[in-house]
Amino acid sequence: MPISICKHGAPFVVQHENRYGSGASQSSSLSKSIRHISNSHEEIKFISCYSANGACFSNAQMLANASGRPVIGYYGKINKLTASLDNSGRIFRPQHKLAANICYVGNRLLSAPVQLGFGLKHLLTCHSNGNVR
């Protein structure tokens, strides 16, 4: 039975511990957080919006590489219910070291404009006194 990780996500970006970062940078901490609770060969269901988008640069691929396990990622918006109802997930397997390193860099580069967009949105939705709407 696969273990499930549920996180907010966007293409190439994952929210973990109340901050957004590239899937590449967040995948090692996500992998460490489940290392002690399951068999090292079990699949991981990565229930996170857009976790499969980006193919080899996707957040699901980053988690597969970091954990050494197969990861099921999802295209577009997803939640626990829709993830259990359909077979829209795609399985990502850990890559060889060279490919994993290239894709790690690609994910980090592709996440930059998305993170910039989040920063601008936050900036534009702040009141002058610093409170967020």
Swiss-Prot record:
<comment type="function">
    <text>Effector proteins function to alter host cell physiology and promote bacterial survival in host tissues.</text>
</comment>
<dbReference type="GO" id="GO:0030430">
    <property type="term" value="C:host cell cytoplasm"/>
</dbReference>
<protein>
    <recommendedName>
        <fullName>Secreted effector protein SteB</fullName>
    </recommendedName>
</protein>
<keyword id="KW-0964">Secreted</keyword>
<keyword id="KW-1035">Host cytoplasm</keyword>
<keyword id="KW-0843">Virulence</keyword>
<dbReference type="GO" id="GO:0005576">
    <property type="term" value="C:extracellular region"/>
</dbReference>
